Amino acid sequence: MSAWMSAGFS
């Protein structure tokens, strides 16, 4: 899992 995935891939 990547940081942008955790953010909600906006």
UniProtKB/Swiss-Prot annotation:
**From which residue to which does any coiled coil extend?**
none
GO terms under biological process: ATP biosynthetic process; proton transmembrane transport
Q: Highest taxon of the source?
A: Eukaryota
Q: Does the keyword Ion transport apply?
A: yes
Where located? Mitochondrion inner membrane
UniProt topology in membrane: Peripheral membrane protein
Q: Which UniProt keywords apply?
A: ATP synthesis, CF(1), Hydrogen ion transport, Ion transport, Membrane, Mitochondrion, Mitochondrion inner membrane, Transport
Determine if Oxidoreductase is one of this entry's keywords. Answer: no
The cellular component terms of Gene Ontology attached to this UniProt record, alphabetical and capped at eight, are:
mitochondrial inner membrane; proton-transporting ATP synthase complex
Subunit composition? F-type ATP synthases have 2 components, the catalytic core F(1) and the membrane-embedded component F(0), linked together by a central stalk and a peripheral stalk. The central stalk, also called rotor shaft, is often seen as part of F(1). The peripheral stalk is seen as part of F(0). F(0) contains the membrane channel next to the rotor. F-type ATP synthases form dimers but each monomer functions independently in ATP generation.
The text of the family note is: Belongs to the eukaryotic ATPase epsilon family.
Q: What does this protein do?
A: Mitochondrial membrane ATP synthase (F(1)F(0) ATP synthase or Complex V) produces ATP from ADP in the presence of a proton gradient across the membrane which is generated by electron transport complexes of the respiratory chain. F-type ATP synthases consist of two structural domains, F(1) - containing the extramembraneous catalytic core, and F(0) - containing the membrane proton channel, linked together by a central stalk and a peripheral stalk.
The protein here is known as ATP synthase subunit epsilon, mitochondrial
Species this chain originates from: Yarrowia lipolytica (strain CLIB 122 / E 150) (Yeast)
